């Protein structure tokens, strides 16, 4: 049994615990994180009560750090912040820390806290997880903007343009209008009814996360490298699992200088070669 498995197994059920936990990792994204967290709040999410879920925000060494009081007072008592001061560059340990703290029966992981979500994500993820005893609930991934962000940036696309896009759809008044100003990302580029290569909001029952052993902390590159793809693959390879893809919901990536999503094409090719070599080793 892994250290994470022991930590998860040692947590005893608490009276009044939430049905769901969502672990969100943030690192140096002061512009994007508040939007992401608002999109997970009861003021935005539909068909779900604040007592039904908790959001565990893991600050993976941000400088300056997120303010615990601001997080909990702004977004509600079902939000809590965990701060990792001596944080490794990969988000793997941060996710595992969040998993160990999670109290819900269904646990979602958002490895990149710069992603907005649609208003029915939590409701339908909960319903999807209940379709099968061993459901793997995934979402399509999108970029804000009308091209892959690394290509759009070469034409001058920046955070001001992204802010204008969100204003043009009056976000967050109707979160489903995000689909109007977004492009499917590489994980989902084959389209609505095709398999995805990773999910930036991945929901499993608690015991499946335990069986999986959490995220593999050997993925120690900044940003995690192929960590998220590996996690999704390993989840699907667990015995007797059933994939569930939420077609009407999604996650939407904001510009923030991500090591994979917002780097020049040439730099990405170098990184992919390095990450693949690391993965094969």
Segments predicted by a language model, with ranges:
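Short, well-formed alpha-helical segments that are part of the catalytic scaffolds
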Residues: 7, 29-45
């Amino acid at each position: 049994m892994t250290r994470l498995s022991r930590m998860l197994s040692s947590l005893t059920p608490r009276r009044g615990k939430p049905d769901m936990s969502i672990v969100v990792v943030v690192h140096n994204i002061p512009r994007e994180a508040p939007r992401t967290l608002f999109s997970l709040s009861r003021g935005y999410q539909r068909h779900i009560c604040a007592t039904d879920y908790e959001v565990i925000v893991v600050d993976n060494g941000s400088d300056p750090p997120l303010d615990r009081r601001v997080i909990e007072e702004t977004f509600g008592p079902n939000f809590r912040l965990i701060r990792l001061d001596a944080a490794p560059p990969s988000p793997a340990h941060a996710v595992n820390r969040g998993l160990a703290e999670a109290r819900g029966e269904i646990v979602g992981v958002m490895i990149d806290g710069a992603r907005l979500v649609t208003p029915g994500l939590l409701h339908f993820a909960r319903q999807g997880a209940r379709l099968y005893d061993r459901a793997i609930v995934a979402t399509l991934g999108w970029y804000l903007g009308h091209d892959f962000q690394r290509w759009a940036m070469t034409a001058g696309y920046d955070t001001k343009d992204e802010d204008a896009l969100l204003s043009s759809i009056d976000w967050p008044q109707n979160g489903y209008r995000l689909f109007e100003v977004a492009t499917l990302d590489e994980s989902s580029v084959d389209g609505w009814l095709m398999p995805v290569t990773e999910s930036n909001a991945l929901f499993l029952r608690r015991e499946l996360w335990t069986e999986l052993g959490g995220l593999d902390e050997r993925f120690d590159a900044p940003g995690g490298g192929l960590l998220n793809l590996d996690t999704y693959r390993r989840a699907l390879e667990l015995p007797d699992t059933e994939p569930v893809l939420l077609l009407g919901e999604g996650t939407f990536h904001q510009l923030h200088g991500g090591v994979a999503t917002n780097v020049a094409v040439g730099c990405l090719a170098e990184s992919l070669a390095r990450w693949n070599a690391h993965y094969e080793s």
